[in-house]
Amino acid sequence: SLKRRINRLFALDRFPSFAEFRFRLINEPSYLKRFVEEITVNVTEMFRDPSFFKVLHKDVFPILATYPLIRIWHAGCATGEEVFSTAILLQEANLLHKSILYATDLNPGVLHVASQGIFSLQHMKQYSENYIEAGGKNEFSQYYSAKYNRAIFNKGLSSKMVFSTHNLVSDRSFNEFQLIMCRNVMIYFDEATRR
């Protein structure tokens, strides 16, 4: 939970009081950056919950296809697995060429990782299984090249992506979108914030 992660950081950095902890958060940008990196959860995988992606491809993409330009926002994109998963399916549906995928996160460190389009090769077997279960049409390995222990995803996918920091709670929407995906972050918000 969020409370547990904050308490862990508070104890780890041995603050004598919450007031001192709060003071550092407010007055030291470098500590605020550390705080954000420590409390955000960035565990995700490609085609996580394959049935979701199957429905996205089968039921949502035909509606998106009616738009001249498709704008999709991946809010809380973490290290980018979900946005790359969506790009792959858009390409297979012949929709990527007219799409822009906006990938945002509060944590600039994970955004940098996401923008590289490089993932651990050890996860590709699981991602490939998820891809097939999600209704993927091709060999999953055609979307990346293996180099040492890394899978480097094709630049044709990331060329349709825009990466930026964004705080869902305090920042406004920056465009109009046909689809907003925030599956990685909604679980952390209370009911009032979700609305």
Feature map (PLM): residue ranges:
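Short, well-ordered amphipathic alpha-helices
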Residues: V55-V60, V83-Q91, S115
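Extended basic-aromatic, gly/pro-enriched interface segments that bind polyanionic ligands
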Residues: S99-M181, V185, D190
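Short alpha-helix of the ABC ATPase nucleotide-binding domain corresponding to the H-loop/switch region
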Residues: E191-R195
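Short strand->helix junction
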Residues: N42-M46, T79, S170, I187-Y188
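Conserved class I S-adenosyl-L-methionine
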Residues: Y67-S85, S99-Y102
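Conserved AdoMet
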Residues: S1-W73
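Short helix-capping segments at alpha-helix termini
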Residues: E92-H97
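Conserved hydrophobic residues forming the short capping helix/wall of the S-adenosyl-L-methionine
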Residues: F10, L90, I118
